[in-house]
């Protein structure tokens, strides 16, 4: 996986139609400009992959997080669609058709950013935002990719552990691939350290952190 950054991203072409004529393929493409300029003070983000640890830490608290003096510790929040159903996120990621419909019908997309695939953006013009560079990752792994893409230097991973319910078993390796692609970014896996995948904690740019430590460190 290659590290990419929003500062270098002007936009990308999206394929609208593909045709085969006389054995030759032709495509109709449309340029989609980058619609987001993400300005953040602290360089910190929280990626909420699931509500698994909600009994230990109510992630909804982050919706009101101010980050201490002058917002120096404020966290931008990234979360999957299920989390977006419970709180306002700075950036949500959802690719499931059923959950996208739920977010749209609830009015969530009117005032909030929801990233999804090019196919779903074309199917629902003006409702969703295009995932930059189509990373080909599961939603839960897209979160840290986007946070690093946006230039955050410290990323706190909440709801990521061995018991996180994800249908595709490759998800933990995808998370590791993101970590490896951004060696200059510090990834904190928040929760019970013994419940984390060992492969996540092998790189020098990762660290396990309890919720008590997270609350103190981020002034939550």
Model-derived features: positions:
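Metal-ion/cofactor- or nucleotide/acyl-coenzyme-handling active-site neighborhoods
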Residues: 1-220
């Amino acid at each position: 996986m290659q590290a990419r950054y929003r500062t270098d991203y002007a936009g990308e072409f999206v394929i609208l139609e593909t045709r085969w004529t006389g054995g030759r393929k032709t495509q109709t493409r449309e340029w989609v400009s980058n619609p987001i300029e993400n300005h953040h003070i602290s360089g910190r983000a929280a990626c909420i992959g699931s509500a698994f640890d909600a009994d230990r830490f109510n992630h909804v608290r982050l919706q009101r997080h101010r980050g201490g003096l002058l917002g120096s510790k404020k966290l931008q929040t990234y979360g999957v669609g299920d989390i977006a159903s419970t709180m306002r996120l700075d950036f949500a990621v959802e690719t499931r058709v059923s959950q996208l419909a739920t977010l749209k019908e609830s009015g969530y997309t009117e005032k909030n950013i929801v990233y999804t695939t090019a196919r779903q953006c074309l199917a629902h013009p003006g409702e969703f935002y295009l995932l930059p560079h189509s990373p080909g990752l599961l939603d839960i792994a897209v979160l840290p990719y986007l946070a690093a893409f946006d230039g955050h230097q410290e990323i706190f991973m909440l709801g990521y552990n061995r018991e996180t319910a994800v249908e595709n078993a490759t998800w933990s390796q995808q998370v590791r691939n993101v970590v490896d692609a951004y060696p200059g970014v510090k990834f904190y896996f928040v929760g019970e350290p013994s419940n984390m995948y060992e492969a996540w904690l092998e790189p020098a740019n990762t660290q396990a952190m309890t919720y008590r430590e997270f609350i103190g460190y981020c002034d939550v």
